[in-house]
């Protein structure tokens, strides 16, 4: 059995093949704004799979994928078999990506656990001591800080967030990078400390997403950086639902 795992985020949509036991080397990516049946036919021409599992946070793309996929397919939701309970008053509000992260984290790192996913938004998702999804925190992503300043000021430029050489910037770009990276690490540390205090127990902390490695370098409380936690959550969910 070969699965096609589809992780549709706001910025990019990933397509990864897997067996029931592990991810396979074949990986494809399409910018989310470009996803269409025609584009997928082009990028994934010749890709063979038996069934697909999807986590999508973009309704337009979800519809495109429903029309494009002809094999058995499961869209991850709170109604899926997850191997993780849901202790949340409005489960249909939970993003499919957050559910996939919870599934992957519980399987690979145990529980309690916090998954920090650095994307367009940063999400903190909490899996409690009883292996239940409890909720979490949503904040603007790292890139959003620089984008906001560029859009709403006359003279500040766009920046590419990267490790500052020092805190005291000696140019506008250096000062913005320092504010973004060090400020963001402060945000992450504060939220993690408060989550741990509310849980009353020390959880494993797993970081994933595009900015995970950069931010984790300065946040000792992050135990693991795992770029594939969402995909492995999808792989596990495929085995439970297909």
From Swiss-Prot:
Disulfide bonds: none annotated. It is an enzyme of class 2 (transferase). A monovalent cation. Ammonium or potassium. GO terms for cellular component: cytoplasm. Keywords: ATP-binding, Coenzyme A biosynthesis, Cytoplasm, Kinase, Metal-binding, Nucleotide-binding, Potassium, Transferase. Its cofactor is NH4(+); K(+). Transmembrane segments: none annotated. One of its GO terms (molecular function) is metal ion binding. It comes from the Bacteria. The keyword Nucleotide-binding applies. ATP binds at residues 7-14, 120. It catalyses: (R)-pantothenate + ATP = (R)-4'-phosphopantothenate + ADP + H(+). One of its GO terms (biological process) is coenzyme A biosynthetic process. InterPro entries: ATPase_NBD, Type_III_PanK. The active site is at residue 97. Pathway: Cofactor biosynthesis; coenzyme A biosynthesis; CoA from (R)-pantothenate: step 1/5. Substrate binds at residues 88, 95-98, 172. K(+) binds at residue 117. The keyword Cytoplasm applies. It is found in: Cytoplasm. Catalyzes the phosphorylation of pantothenate (Pan), the first step in CoA biosynthesis. Homodimer. Belongs to the type III pantothenate kinase family. This is Type III pantothenate kinase. The gene is coaX.
